[in-house]
């Protein structure tokens, strides 16, 4: 449905040439939700704006719905863009129009009959859960409701593709979850292909099928969500996954913790599990094999793409040699181990 091939985008500032995207290639299959994640300034927004040629690539090709947009004349490009909806971090609603009026705008620009516009607006408001807000104005809506209006408006022309540019970044967590649930529902109900960009791995975890990691204008890793959470290959992907899980060391442990090992002190370990290591009885195995006792302080587990992953804080009590052997055993079984200190 979407194929970007060797996309490079450069900007000229005076005598300086800035490369925002460098040889980026990706493919999004029809009906898929594809996430691109990266830090601020990585090139995410430039990438998604190249898909509908709001930013024209310096080189490379953009194919959407089997049409090479980069070679279309302007008139045909305008027609092709009707098959590509887009929503943004900021909702860009017209304050002087009601909810229904905002949703109707693209239909009016297409010169549809008023009766057809009214029917379509009613359908879209129902789809977005805004049936009771048709006559409300944007100033009277919450952030989540405004984004729902923007989604309904983006779907007005029955696009085959929806581009989401940091669509939940300005929303609180509960509202973010409701918007993501709406996007997932639309994807499943309409078979809509969705390409979204975000800096939050939690967004990818909740709704995406595939994910790519972008850094300094380059895609450094692409895979299914389940595979990336199971076996992240780059440090940046690993950091994004870690950001979805966080455990604080309890206050009483912090007060007793030392940086250096000494006789009688027990190491506090942070263990990160992905893939098969999550369900394997590895702590029990270390106790049997290496004569160590493990005391779990706290743990958090989650799912992404059908794969379980998690993080755990534990005390590992044993002599230094046995503890070192137990840690090595965990690492051999794809558990990331960090010694946080000693108590």
Swiss-Prot record:
Its main location: membrane. Residues 2-241 form the ABC transporter domain. The keyword ATP-binding applies. The keyword Translocase applies. SMART domains: AAA, NIL. Part of the ABC transporter complex MetNIQ involved in methionine import. Responsible for energy coupling to the transport system. This is Methionine import ATP-binding protein MetN.
